[in-house]
Amino acid sequence: MAKSNYITRQGWLALDQELKFLWKEERPKVTQAVSDAAALGDRSENAEYIYGKRRLREIDRRVRFLTKRLEVLQIVDYNPKQEGKVFFGAWVELENEEGETKQYRIVGCDEFAPAKNWISIDSPVARALIGKTLDDEVRVETPSGFITLYVNKIWYEK
């Protein structure tokens, strides 16, 4: 399945900030370090030079990715019409059949962060939740079988 191109405004700004940091701050520092290491002479056994060149390639790869990705991403802002229903950017409190609750935020694949309970819009749980309302029951297929979740709360960061 292809990655969706949706992102929250905060997510887009974070990626843009990362791009600017890499291009304007990190890359010039690493370029200078590589230049200094190259001036020391033999480059074949110069660990600083070799590491610096590797780091420069990593930065350039990430800069290319971010530049291309930021061009195609679609920012999805909060809309008051979304209230009461689950859409992109929503925080949702779910309850499983055992009564355990957990809160998730539906975000773009570029913002996916399990530690923050941010799930990708492309995930099975998020896809099953889209359009649901308070007290709806949702069946989600997982690798271990189907699970049933109940929508307890829906809210948006405005």
From Swiss-Prot:
One of its GO terms (molecular function) is DNA binding. Residues 53-75 form a coiled coil. The keyword Coiled coil applies. GO terms for biological process: DNA-templated transcription elongation; regulation of DNA-templated transcription elongation. Keywords: Coiled coil, DNA-binding, Transcription, Transcription regulation. Necessary for efficient RNA polymerase transcription elongation past template-encoded arresting sites. The arresting sites in DNA have the property of trapping a certain fraction of elongating RNA polymerases that pass through, resulting in locked ternary complexes. Cleavage of the nascent transcript by cleavage factors such as GreA or GreB allows the resumption of elongation from the new 3'terminus. GreB releases sequences of up to 9 nucleotides in length. PANTHER family: TRANSCRIPTION ELONGATION FACTOR GREA, TRANSCRIPTION ELONGATION FACTOR GREB. Belongs to the GreA/GreB family. GreB subfamily. This is Transcription elongation factor GreB. The gene is greB.
